[in-house]
Amino acid sequence: MDVLHAHDLYGEQLIDRVGDAVNEDAGDDLDTLVEGQQQQRLGVYRQMDILLDAPQEPPLGVFPAQGGPNGPPRLRKKRSFYTMTKPTPPCQSQEPEMCVLMASVTRAMRHVREDQRGEYFANYLVENMTSQNYPNGVGLPQHWGQL
């Protein structure tokens, strides 16, 4: 009679882990790699799971606009573009501040055809921006961007 010994039954199987015996694994670590990847994915998504499980911030009962310990709900003021704008004084709504030379060239350009205005503008400045027309620089731009 053959007597079965425990070590004879499992002598042929090398068990790395419990999963190897259940899955009849050949002893390679393929399932270990797959499980490691699953653990890594769980670690990546752990923070997202924590955020999704978190309660709404702030809790609706504590927020004063919804009522609660601070008193009755307060109505929020609705803002509109028309209510936020302030009327400008009449002097600001007209033409912006400009030097005398720019004002005169603007007036002169109104009488020139649209396709010739660029050339006319340059010629007008060359002819009229002289020390004879503006003695001691009075009326000329005092800083960049004033033209």
UniProtKB/Swiss-Prot annotation:
Any single Pfam family the record assigns to this protein: SOTI
Superkingdom of this protein's organism: Eukaryota
Glycosylation sites: 128
Disulfide bonds: none
InterPro entries on file: Soti
Renumbered residue ranges of the record's region Disordered: 57-76
Keyword set, alphabetical order: Developmental protein, Differentiation, Glycoprotein, Spermatogenesis
GO terms classed as biological process: sperm individualization
Keyword hit for Magnesium: no
Family: Belongs to the male-specific scotti family.
Purpose: Post-meiotically transcribed gene that has a role in late spermiogenesis; required for actin cone progression during spermatid individualization.
Identification of the protein by name: Male-specific protein scotti
Species: Drosophila simulans (Fruit fly)
